[in-house]
Design a protein with these regions (language model features):
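Topogenic membrane-insertion module of multi-pass membrane proteins
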Residues: 2-60, 64, 68, 155-158
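Small-residue-rich segments of transmembrane alpha-helices in multi-pass membrane proteins
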Residues: 35-40, 161-175, 197, 225-230, ...
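Membrane-embedded alpha-helical segments that form the functional core of polytopic membrane enzymes
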Residues: 38, 50-78, 135-146, 185-207
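Acidic (Asp/Glu-rich) catalytic motifs at the cytosolic membrane interface
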Residues: 67-92, 203-225
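Multi-pass membrane catalytic core of lipid/isoprenoid biosynthesis enzymes
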Residues: 88-129, 221-257, 297, 305
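Intramembrane alpha-helical segments
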Residues: 96-182
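Functional transmembrane core segments of multi-pass inner-membrane proteins
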Residues: 162-213, 231-235
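Extended hydrophobic alpha-helices typical of membrane-associated regions
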Residues: 256-312
Length: 312
């Protein structure tokens, strides 16, 4: 799979073609949108009967999350190109569509508008299940997409926002709309599950910023990794995964005391430790893109094992 994707990126890409849009969507990042919704849905299912479990809002949550992730990728691609942050000769990460000329800026602007509108239309029916207050949550998600690339990531707030918008918001709100009205609260277990999810997904941002730390420092992008340095940056990666896993272990064990479910979760830690060891060996440069791929895989492992453990 990695070879095929590299081949696709290195071969000629026709401007505004299907292949160009496929690459701009960054399919590997979609796991970060799917996992939080899956965790919120799994916990809701474990707390209700099949009859009480609300299935349609779960589908809407999945659709909203995926569309917003694609929208965020388009926005990031567009504004980084405008700012000159994705110069092909300097970029360490995967190639970006606008900077490479695969997609014109005008076409990307239209795509951003269309994605934002579709996401809003998709999320609007959720107010039937969770009330009008969900409108504010949806608007916050849309606002986050724009502010993260344009402002907030330059102030070192990226990690906090990932925990909020890839952990607390999607996990808690998915649970909220999936259960019957009598259960529409935010119990401690849901909040801890959401924090666990946010921390694990943040490992993807941490390794991305760890790779780009020198370029970010030069461009004035003061990420958390730029602030703490290489050594503590690697430790943050390790700790985020460990703390996230411990929180999940607590939720799973207190919910059903399933020893099998709890043991399953160890598999994620093994994968996380392996990625960390490779990360500190490679240290810098484009080789760290391998750790980015490993981390995306680990998030998928975390999500899959978590769902199984919650449902056992």
């Amino acid at each position: 799979m990695e070879f095929l994707q590299l081949t696709m990126q290195n071969s000629a890409v026709t401007t505004n073609s299907f292949r160009a849009w496929y690459l701009a969507m960054r399919p590997k990042t979609l796991v970060s949108a799917i996992v939080p919704v899956a965790l919120g849905a799994a916990y809701a299912f474990s707390q209700t009967s099949i009859e009480q479990f609300q299935k349609l809002p779960i589908l809407l949550c999945f659709a909203f999350a995926i569309i917003m992730q694609i929208d965020a990728n388009f926005i990031n691609d567009y504004f980084d190109c405008l700012k000159g942050n994705d110069k092909p000769e300097e970029r360490l990460g995967p190639k970006r569509a606008c900077s490479e000329g695969w997609i014109t800026l005008a076409a990307m602007r239209r795509a951003i508008v269309i994605c934002t509108i579709i996401a809003a239309i998709t999320g609007l029916p959720l107010i039937v299940y969770g009330g009008y207050k969900l409108i504010f949550a949806g608007l916050a998600c849309i606002l986050f997409c724009f502010l993260y690339t344009t402002k907030l990531s330059y102030w070192g707030l990226g990690d906090l926002l990932v925990i909020l918008f890839f952990g607390l918001t999607p996990v808690c709100l998915t649970y909220y709309v999936a259960v019957p009205p009598a259960l529409q609260t935010f119990p401690l277990e849901v909040i801890l599950l959401a924090l666990a999810c946010g921390l694990v997904i943040d490992t993807l941002l941490i390794v991305n910023n760890y790779r780009d730390r020198d370029n970010d420092r030069k461009s004035g992008k003061i990420t958390l990794i730029v602030r703490v340095g290489e050594r503590w940056g690697a430790r943050l990666y390790l700790l985020a995964g460990i703390i996230g896993e411990l929180l999940l272990f607590y939720v799973v064990y207190t919910q059903n005391e399933s020893k099998i479910g709890s043991m399953l979760l160890i598999l994620y830690l093994l994968a996380h430790f392996y990625a960390y060891e490779k990360m500190i060996q490679l240290r810098q440069g484009r080789e760290l893109n391998k750790i980015l791929n490993l981390t995306a895989r680990n998030i998928f492992i975390f999500g899959t094992l978590s769902v199984f453990a919650l449902l056992l």
